[in-house]
């Protein structure tokens, strides 16, 4: 039976071929960058740095480190920058996009309350990527 990992990055340790993790995350970063650039050309540097952080997250498990400081810094940076991009892009779009953004974060809060805070990092990573896709498609 599959368990939900503590974070998306923890999945690398359950894979048969860990190098596939890096390729998968780089593909996600490339698709995320493409979505972000196609939605708004005004914030391309923000999109690039955000997805570059995510790309580094993909490569970090291959570098053996006990404290994973760079991994955490890149992960947090990628999540924060992607959400900044969501907010500034949503502000330039019609008002329903802003309402959708606020509603989605409220739903995330409800999920965390129902899950009693378990696996918060995993759900936050999934939610940030879902927010990027949702705002890019709006």
Which residues make up each language-model segment?
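N-terminal topogenic module of multi-pass integral membrane proteins
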Residues: 1-40
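A glycine-rich, hydrophobic loop/mini-helix early in the fold
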Residues: 24-25, 29-62
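Hydrophobic cores of alpha-helical transmembrane segments in multi-pass inner/ER membrane proteins
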Residues: 22-33, 80-89, 104-107, 127-136
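Transmembrane alpha-helices of multi-pass eukaryotic membrane proteins
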Residues: 17-26, 42-47, 73-75, 96-101, ...
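Terminal transmembrane helical module of multi-pass membrane proteins
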Residues: 92-138
């Amino acid at each position: 039976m599959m368990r939900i990992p503590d974070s998306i990055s923890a999945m690398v340790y359950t894979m048969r071929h860990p190098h596939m993790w890096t390729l998968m995350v780089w593909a996600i970063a490339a698709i995320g960058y493409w979505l972000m650039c196609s939605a708004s050309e005004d914030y391309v540097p923000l999109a690039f740095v955000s997805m570059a952080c995510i790309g580094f997250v993909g490569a970090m498990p291959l570098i053996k480190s006990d404290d994973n400081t760079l991994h955490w810094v890149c992960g947090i940076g990628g999540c924060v920058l992607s959400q900044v991009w969501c907010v500034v892009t949503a502000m330039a779009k019609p008002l329903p996009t802003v309402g959708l953004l606020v509603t989605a974060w409220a739903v995330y809060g409800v999920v965390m309350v129902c899950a009693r805070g378990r696996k918060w990092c995993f759900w936050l990573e999934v939610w940030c990527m879902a927010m990027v896709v949702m705002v890019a498609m709006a």
